[in-house]
Amino acid sequence: MTGEGYKQAIVVRRDLGMGRGKAAAQAAHASCEAVFLILESGRPEWRRWLEMWRLQGQAKVVLRVESLAELQEVYSKAVEEGLPASFVRDAGKTQLEPGTPTAAAVGPAPSRLVDRITGGLKLF
């Protein structure tokens, strides 16, 4: 095992006024979708990152953005950098309209790479 740390950053929109439970559910969706993406990707590097993250306790940080544009920017940067990333749109069954973008996840990946994308964001 290397000394490098691994984590996942989950980014949630605060401008939507979601309740705490709703925001937590959207964060969970983003986290799970990023893991599913890795498992389905066939990318050995991502699979290695996932395993290291799992072995190190699955560190997660939940961060906030204040707009759709900010959420899209985080997701786009992660994809451009070659990191596993998910982008969640709500199903519209409770508080939001169907298709409303709510959250994204970056990683699991080496912490230094995740921080390049999300390091300037505030905690949710």
Swiss-Prot record:
Keyword terms, alphabetized: Cytoplasm, Hydrolase
CDD domains according to UniProt: PTH2
Catalytic activity: an N-acyl-L-alpha-aminoacyl-tRNA + H2O = an N-acyl-L-amino acid + a tRNA + H(+)
GO BP, sorted A to Z: translation
GO cellular component, one term: cytosol
Entry-linked InterPro entries: Pep_tRNA_hydro_II_dom_sf, Pept_tRNA_hydro_arch, PTH2
Name of the featured protein: Peptidyl-tRNA hydrolase
Coiled-coil regions listed: none
Organism: Aeropyrum pernix (strain ATCC 700893 / DSM 11879 / JCM 9820 / NBRC 100138 / K1)
Classification via Gene3D superfamilies: Bit1 (3.40.1490.10)
Family: Belongs to the PTH2 family.
Functional description taken from the UniProt entry: The natural substrate for this enzyme may be peptidyl-tRNAs which drop off the ribosome during protein synthesis.
Major localization listed first in the record, in broad terms: cytoplasm
Location within or outside the cell: Cytoplasm
Disulphide connectivity of cysteines: none
Enzyme Commission number(s): 3.1.1.29
Protein origin, superkingdom: Archaea
Keyword Acyltransferase annotated: no
